[in-house]
Regions:
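Conserved, mostly hydrophobic/aromatic
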Residues: 3, 28, 52, 89, ...
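Structured beta-strand/loop patches that form or line metal/cofactor-binding pockets in enzymes
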Residues: 1-32, 36-37, 320-327, 380-382
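Metal-dependent enolase-superfamily TIM-barrel catalytic cores that perform enediolate-based chemistry
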Residues: 116, 120, 124-233
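Shared catalytic-loop signature of beta/alpha-barrel
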Residues: 50, 66, 204, 210, ...
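Extended hydrophobic packing segments that form well-structured cores
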Residues: 349-387
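Glycine-rich, aromatic-flanked loop segments that form ligand/cofactor-binding clefts
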Residues: 90-127
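Metal- or metallocofactor-binding catalytic centers and their adjacent structured scaffolds
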Residues: 24-101, 382-387
């Protein structure tokens, strides 16, 4: 069995676009993946056809280690764009393998390790501006069954917080904590905004809210700084979504710079490399919680990884807070119920692209909203129905 055809599909999802891909074998089996890289989807699509396609056509889909390892070796300059294209292909290969073996992908990755897959909500704060708004949105999310919520309370801060910015952030966190009570987990997103000193000071002020973790308190590529911040604070630290290579994750884990590793399966090489990262983390008693802020095919890959990974902790969930047509982009897929994920027992990933719905939402060029000016907060806190 060889890969005979390579296709890509761009579709809009409000503020961003999703890039799906499909591989077809000479025996007629198909596999789908996702290569969405926020606000760079057309660039990734070009890489898919001008660089990846020639390296995947004619290859045996079962030869994942050789095929994907060879592409990672051959990329030379590296980076998120090309690794996203490679990652999407890797997931599509697993989809083909699962269908060929008549097994869901998670069973090929080690089998079931968990009875259920807890989710934490992200994007739940649509339309919120004030502490009262955040309180109301938080209660709505908990009413859907979520037992953990993530949000960035820091506005447009960069490196340091003024006293006013610090107080405003703490007021937002306090409002959400009061609204949901002590039994709901809060993940505080920093987006790598702060200097090490300001991050430590801010995390100490957050201790009274007992967050599950503080995410990217400093720039995540500065792994030494992450480790230093972790040593000086009592709160758990999470990071990893903006790391891409096995060497990056080895350093992150060996320095014990985090308590939770957040690899993004869509950007770090796919499922097999993510399993290797999780195994390294397990040796250090570090848990994993995959980042996933893109579409339904990427989420499906995460869930197969989660179910088969012993040190999995909790899965990020935008699914119920995305555009209304999100789940219609694929067939056979509605994976969340009352704040937890579940997987169908279908072969492969368990879903297929719906080309009709995809074509109804064509690509729209959007500009990346900088996290350090007012546009990002305005855009990301719009209600999805307004997009």
């Amino acid at each position: 069995m060889k890969i005979a055809r390579f296709e890509t599909f761009l579709t809009n999802s409000g503020l961003r676009n999703y890039l799906f891909l499909r591989l077809t074998t000479d025996s007629g089996l198909t596999g789908i993946g996702e290569a969405s890289l926020e606000w760079q989807e057309k660039t990734v699509e070009t890489v898919c056809h001008e660089w990846v396609e020639d390296r995947i056509l004619g290859r045996d889909p079962f030869d994942i280690e050789a095929v994907i390892g060879g592409m990672i070796r051959d990329q030379y300059q590296g980076g998120s764009t090309i690794l996203t294209a490679i990652s999407g292909v890797e997931v599509a290969l697993w989809d083909i393998i699962g269908k060929a073996c008549q097994q869901p992908v998670y069973k090929l990755l080690g089998g079931r390790c968990h009875t259920h897959l807890p989710a934490y909500a992200n994007g739940w704060y649509g339309g919120a501006r004030t502490p009262q708004d955040f309180s109301e949105r938080a209660r709505e999310a908990v009413g859907r069954g979520y037992r953990a919520l993530k949000f960035d309370p820091f506005g447009t801060a960069w490196k340091n917080l003024t006293p006013e910015e610090s107080e405003a952030a703490l007021e937002l966190v306090a409002a959400v904590r009061e609204a949901v009570g002590p039994g709901v987990g809060l993940m505080i997103e920093f987006h790598g905004r702060l200097s090490a000193g300001c991050a430590v000071e801010t995390m100490r002020k957050l201790e009274r809210f007992h967050p599950v973790w503080c995410e990217e308190p400093v720039a995540p590529e500065c792994i030494d700084l992450l480790a230093e911040v972790k040593k000086q604070t009592t709160l758990p630290v999470a990071a990893g979504e903006r790391l891409y290579t096995l060497a990056d994750f080895y350093r992150l884990i060996s320095l014990r710079a985090v308590d939770v590793v957040q690899m993004d399966i869509s950007h770090c090489g796919g499922l097999w490399l993510s399993k290797k990262i999780a195994a390294m983390a397990a040796v250090q008693d570090i848990r994993v919680s995959p980042h996933c802020s893109v579409g339904p095919v990427a989420l499906a890959a995460c869930l197969h990884f989660d179910l088969s990974t012993p040190n999995f902790m909790v899965q990020e969930a935008f699914a119920e807070f995305d555009v209304p047509w999100r789940n219609s982009l694929v067939r056979g897929w509605n994976p969340i119920r009352e704040g937890a994920f579940f997987l169908p027992e279908a072969p492969g990933l368990g879903l297929e692209l719906d080309e009709r719905v995809i074509s109804e939402h064509p690509y729209i060029r959007n500009t990346f909203p900088s996290l350090w000016d007012g546009d990002w907060f305005e855009n990301f806190t719009r209600k999805k129905g307004d997009q």
